């Protein structure tokens, strides 16, 4: 079930939808990035799918979210899933929606089953269409690719009418850089973590990588400020980099990942993901500065020291532990975050001309091929969860894309092939259709179209704008592999993800211009507040702004490696 269920969801806990809880599941269609269920037989390679092929266009509010509920009006949402039928896997589908054996209403919170009823007047008819299909694929990955291609052709998503040009979008997002700057503490930063949507007041949290992305946003602000006469942005960005050079490292030479000045606490467990995202931002910054004729030998020395820590942390199989302490003692050995390290390692090889970094990057690629891509098992790329998630396959595809810049010949072609395989899996998380909303639900009233937005993970059933370089990766694959569906999907994503831009006249319940929303709740689920059709009340615009900025800078990666 795309964007919701892969294999048996065995990496997800019992408190989320998984085989641990039941061997039969059916869910409402708007939980799925494609309203489809597919069953694949690994022994024979045979698969069956059922796809909703008419257009769901209306939704009705229900007085309860469990048990038998009579809807207040017309809905177009059905359900789909699979069932254990006498030890055989069976496809199920129907109308209106019915979720069993449990519904999923909040992170790690299963609720009782729900069955909806809609009134059908005497003599009234409703016509709904599902298409059954049989196919054969040699592997689970090729099955996912085949089904995605088929679904894309059947649903034919088109770009959303653009509201802003890339330049206009950046001008709006740049207001986040200006308003979120905090200069009251030794570390200067843009405040983008644990903000309230209602007022967007800055918090005391400085976070270098996910979810704050302080260093990447500082680079974005510097580049934009100098190019557009915004000296205020450039000056703030320089102060951020200067403060991190002076105060931003641990005694062991790692980047200080999360510092909460108001609560007077700081993490003492570090992650390969945040460290990698910090180095990634710093190398972009240094390359930009070098192009401007400015050198930073002290920064370069700091980064070299940090990269030596990377080389020490890497396991013999090429993976990196997910979490560790300042003395590099491993806290979480999971290798799911390994692709985040591939990016800065390839960049460091190019910037410093040190072959050790490329060797390390190659070893990460070997690990990803053997343990994630070949097994179609993308997991635990986030900071804490172990479940199946979008970011793992997206990061794997992006890692292989970066490897193509430091390789040639058959080696480069291998990375292209792996990038393509992982990209299909990542694409399966992105919506190919527009879910319907009921009147009074903000997203529906605002005309929101879900096509092009990505489901987050098995544990988190909302959509977001996590994209970064992935649209650029899709355009690269479209040209390199002669696959126009990739570039068409990229166009859908790039147009759709700018829909909810908070700007005067259409703030969409966000307190400040440019603070892009994070938790967009498009189905019967919420992160803590408000439910379908609304945002959660707490959000992290630090990463959403950084993600969209990267999407709006398609030449950034090629420019880095070319220079």
What residue ranges belong to the model's regions?
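Low-complexity, Ser/Thr/Pro/Gly-enriched N-terminal "stalk/linker" regions
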Residues: 120, 138-207, 238-239, 243-258, ...
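Hydrophobic core segments within long, regular secondary-structure runs in both alpha-
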Residues: 163-178, 218, 231-245, 276-279, ...
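Beta-strand/loop-rich accessory regions of lumenal/periplasmic or secreted enzymes
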Residues: 1-122
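Short Pro-Gly-centered flexible turn/kink motifs
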Residues: 117-142
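Non-catalytic carbohydrate-binding regions of carbohydrate-active enzymes
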Residues: 313, 366-378, 382, 407-537, ...
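Well-ordered alpha-helical scaffold segments within catalytic/enzyme domains
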Residues: 215-231, 277-295, 340-355, 395-411, ...
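Carbohydrate-binding/catalytic loop surfaces
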Residues: 185-207, 253-274, 319-340, 377-399, ...
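Aromatic- and glycine-enriched glycan-recognition loops and surfaces
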Residues: 198-251, 265-274, 289-308, 359
